[in-house]
């Protein structure tokens, strides 16, 4: 039996071994074929992002399916393993497993895995708002079973926040000056999120400064006297709220990227400021700005040598604090001129220098920095997207839909994004819907550039495709902060409506141009603005704008080189051929006279613009590389002066091709205002051989305005233009005005200041008169280009010559006017300037009133503003202001044309009311006092049009040309209300007399003298003239029509820190509490012990542990204080802010019932009892007072044996030891320091009698009262001792002095306190 059993056992073991071996072999084969966990390592280098932004650190992996029996969810762990300085660190951030994410306490609220809930294989970490300390090396580790994969992602946070103080004084910058100071420091004004991020990294500065949202704030990490702000003793960013832009403060700036190197120059002999500039120039550099030095310090520069900077300040960067290098903390030190830390050193003083050398000086169009006028206006990612090694994909289901309203920025602040064309990017954006979502790294921004369809396509009626393009140019360095797309911002790829010919698709091909006929379609850049703010969510596709960046020249046919060309701002090719369409979102209006849809429909409408001319261009285009300073951004910063489309003198040949299109523009940003975008139908009619493009309006009796976007905060700059518009926006080198057209076919010779003649043209083919645009002044930034372009074919003066007028014609006609609501018709003005016939004609030119060859001139303009304030617009010389008469509207109705016998200027508005088309309004130069605050919210769009009847132009009644765009000018609401006549006064000063030979017409304004000539304002007031009226701006302390009233300066409580204001003649005086000084009690001269908080001259400390009232008072006395007393509502609020529990105070009536006293012996000056308190409820047992927390700290009397928290109070100024008194000593232990209001008592030594008061008190100024006590011996004892002495020595002193003599010569004892008379009051 034993043998069969052994055999059976052996067979069983063999089968088991074979089974195990088979299983092991199968597992080995599976492992060899594929792994279950694989991480996709990007290896794209360092991730860079700016301070206070969001960034995503990529971590992607793939998982192979496992047998159900062995399924195990992967475990994800993010860890920071190295700091920015390279020190090793092991700081856990979060762990995630099976859709459960646990975040470390120090990272809560700042990190998340946004894609993990939907896709477990995407562990991309979203981090932000970023701090400077977030820079370092991060590790993503994925573990499943025994498999372990990890990837390292370096993060670099760029940008630094710094405080800037004017050279004049502390708090010397208005909001506009603060923005300019930051700009000159190679920075922008910091946003609140920047300052908050800097504070969270330890930034502490007790100087209030402007921020981009017009608030004033400062960061405090350690509370100290004078720096409490609105947060009492708590750390945080203090805020003064939104302030008047004219108030004076310092500023906090944000410098984002260095873009070069800062190096120290320390020659053997130190340099003056001029010498430092020269020394830097000799080394191919320039003096570094303040922002550049801070960025260099942020990147590691450490130099303990003060050096000159570009703004005339002297500073030096310290990384490692050391002796004689400016303090214990790292930072950029500043050398001030005065002891109060103000003023820059004299330029003649000698220091070293810090120079800056740019890496690529030709690349000046990188990040766009726009100043903020309300909330943050910082432009992010103004350059193209960075190079990516992985092809990102956009999944179709993840495209944002129009009903998506979830905020995409966690900070809650508005943050416009500007997308522009990337210059020279060989990357192909090829969507593959099946791949994982990788489009969010390194950026989710879509870089769009639309190319218009050709005219042939449009003529054939086929749908032309618009596609995304990238224009090549010089290689640009990789810039920082290009990973904003990881925040989840996606931009919709909207399919066009049926019948529209627009669309977008990704492409890597550069823009092409049709060459054989020299036709070139200019590449366009799409500017997409995303506004995300509190209370309002904006879709990123709601504001799509087109602008011509590089117009081409030539005629149709063929292919051309893909090399881009760019024209200078004052030069536009005379022959523009092409047809482009681009979608613009419009708000559809009802067509009926009173119909109003309940819900406006949004639809896509194309913009069209075609301009063609048979003749080729008489000049040469030049590539971008020849003009590195040309702006490359496809974003208009507000309405600009428009330039003429032809560079050569006007030709009289009339070859007319009509082109239709729409062009819209928006005013510059304005705080506390809303901006609407409107589209204005515009057609361009080029005339002449050279193809002069003349802006016209379609033939119809009214103007049609369509609202093209949602109401947006006015600080966002937007501009929309037809893609082939021959009126591109330019810089201020060109000033364009409108003058009446002339009916003559020959040019009118005009002689300007320089004496050169210019041609003014109107063709005889146009029986309808209109407006002409004139170039008042053309500055020549590229003279060499002009010489090329003009050549011998120019029959008259070149374009760059001063005084040359180039006049394209504007055919003024209107489309039907349709209003959207019913309401009364409002006439804006009754008293107007009547345009009467006149034989004189000419064109108004700044500084010139010489007109030659007068011709019959006609004028019939209409200027309309699409806003509730309806106003005619005029153009002034740079530096002047435009006055706008305001008109309140009560509603709107469909206005019908009213035939008039003569043509008049019309103002119309659609925001609430409509005005009859033919209402007179004056044109002229208004009188606006300099320095008057303006409201820039007026003037959102303008249309120029005219009716059929014409009258001769009268230059006496129209002194200024009308323009379609205004730049660097301000609009001001002069007056106006419903039913109140608005005034628009025309003032002619001595420098601008009435035009010779032109009599004043009926209805024109008379010339008035200056009412401020004798300055009627008293006490230093400033006189502001407004026609015949004037107003006085009074200095502080005065009021009245002529500043004749001396008001109380103390009404505004100018004294700080509880100081008492005393009004005096022409000023005031502040009486400061102890430990404060200065003219406004703003200087803190004494502090508090550690753990104590100062308020109005006293130190307070809250103790949360509970004690009975007596024990609490005893503990406060042990700390040289008492239970707190309360003497004002401000002090009560301060004490009540400490805790949220009932708290003991020092008030009690333990000695005499109902006679409440403070334990520090101060008077009862303030009471804050609960209703029906004190009530002594326990019949004599309620002798102590408590602050009741749930009733705003009101008082109640309770028994003294309750155990409650308490607040101790003591003075900041302490008295030294009490003065010594002869024959007396102190009662109790003698201490080195005594609190304010402390009292001590003297007692006379044994055998001496006390006279006068025995106590003295420590005064609030730190000095003791003068002791009054006198200790003397009793007179009886003195007589007995004298008699005994006389009897004993009678025989020895026969010649003793008499009693009277002895008393006369007796020496009185000198008391100690008389020696220190100066120390007491």
Curated annotation (Swiss-Prot):
<feature type="region of interest" description="Disordered">
    <location>
        <begin position="683"/>
        <end position="729"/>
    </location>
</feature>
<feature type="disulfide bond">
    <location>
        <begin position="182"/>
        <end position="253"/>
    </location>
</feature>
<feature type="glycosylation site" description="N-linked (GlcNAc...) asparagine">
    <location>
        <position position="1223"/>
    </location>
</feature>
<feature type="compositionally biased region" description="Polar residues">
    <location>
        <begin position="363"/>
        <end position="373"/>
    </location>
</feature>
<dbReference type="InterPro" id="IPR013783">
    <property type="entry name" value="Ig-like_fold"/>
</dbReference>
<dbReference type="InterPro" id="IPR016187">
    <property type="entry name" value="CTDL_fold"/>
</dbReference>
<feature type="disulfide bond">
    <location>
        <begin position="1034"/>
        <end position="1043"/>
    </location>
</feature>
<keyword id="KW-0677">Repeat</keyword>
<dbReference type="GO" id="GO:0001501">
    <property type="term" value="P:skeletal system development"/>
</dbReference>
<dbReference type="InterPro" id="IPR016186">
    <property type="entry name" value="C-type_lectin-like/link_sf"/>
</dbReference>
<feature type="disulfide bond">
    <location>
        <begin position="1215"/>
        <end position="1258"/>
    </location>
</feature>
<feature type="compositionally biased region" description="Basic residues">
    <location>
        <begin position="1275"/>
        <end position="1308"/>
    </location>
</feature>
<dbReference type="GO" id="GO:0045202">
    <property type="term" value="C:synapse"/>
</dbReference>
<keyword id="KW-0245">EGF-like domain</keyword>
<feature type="domain" description="C-type lectin">
    <location>
        <begin position="1084"/>
        <end position="1213"/>
    </location>
</feature>
<dbReference type="GO" id="GO:0007155">
    <property type="term" value="P:cell adhesion"/>
</dbReference>
<keyword id="KW-1015">Disulfide bond</keyword>
<feature type="compositionally biased region" description="Low complexity">
    <location>
        <begin position="935"/>
        <end position="948"/>
    </location>
</feature>
<feature type="disulfide bond">
    <location>
        <begin position="206"/>
        <end position="227"/>
    </location>
</feature>
<feature type="glycosylation site" description="O-linked (Xyl...) (chondroitin sulfate) serine">
    <location>
        <position position="411"/>
    </location>
</feature>
<dbReference type="InterPro" id="IPR000436">
    <property type="entry name" value="Sushi_SCR_CCP_dom"/>
</dbReference>
<keyword id="KW-0964">Secreted</keyword>
<feature type="glycosylation site" description="N-linked (GlcNAc...) asparagine">
    <location>
        <position position="340"/>
    </location>
</feature>
<feature type="region of interest" description="Disordered">
    <location>
        <begin position="745"/>
        <end position="766"/>
    </location>
</feature>
<dbReference type="GO" id="GO:0007417">
    <property type="term" value="P:central nervous system development"/>
</dbReference>
<feature type="region of interest" description="Disordered">
    <location>
        <begin position="455"/>
        <end position="479"/>
    </location>
</feature>
<feature type="disulfide bond">
    <location>
        <begin position="1072"/>
        <end position="1081"/>
    </location>
</feature>
<comment type="function">
    <text>May modulate neuronal adhesion and neurite growth during development by binding to neural cell adhesion molecules (NG-CAM and N-CAM). Chondroitin sulfate proteoglycan; binds to hyaluronic acid.</text>
</comment>
<feature type="disulfide bond">
    <location>
        <begin position="280"/>
        <end position="355"/>
    </location>
</feature>
<feature type="domain" description="EGF-like 2; calcium-binding">
    <location>
        <begin position="1046"/>
        <end position="1082"/>
    </location>
</feature>
<feature type="disulfide bond">
    <location>
        <begin position="1116"/>
        <end position="1208"/>
    </location>
</feature>
<dbReference type="GO" id="GO:0005540">
    <property type="term" value="F:hyaluronic acid binding"/>
</dbReference>
<dbReference type="InterPro" id="IPR000538">
    <property type="entry name" value="Link_dom"/>
</dbReference>
<feature type="glycosylation site" description="N-linked (GlcNAc...) asparagine">
    <location>
        <position position="122"/>
    </location>
</feature>
<protein>
    <recommendedName>
        <fullName>Neurocan core protein</fullName>
    </recommendedName>
</protein>
<feature type="domain" description="Ig-like V-type">
    <location>
        <begin position="38"/>
        <end position="153"/>
    </location>
</feature>
<comment type="similarity">
    <text>Belongs to the aggrecan/versican proteoglycan family.</text>
</comment>
<feature type="region of interest" description="Disordered">
    <location>
        <begin position="531"/>
        <end position="579"/>
    </location>
</feature>
<keyword id="KW-0430">Lectin</keyword>
<dbReference type="InterPro" id="IPR000152">
    <property type="entry name" value="EGF-type_Asp/Asn_hydroxyl_site"/>
</dbReference>
<keyword id="KW-0654">Proteoglycan</keyword>
<dbReference type="GO" id="GO:0030246">
    <property type="term" value="F:carbohydrate binding"/>
</dbReference>
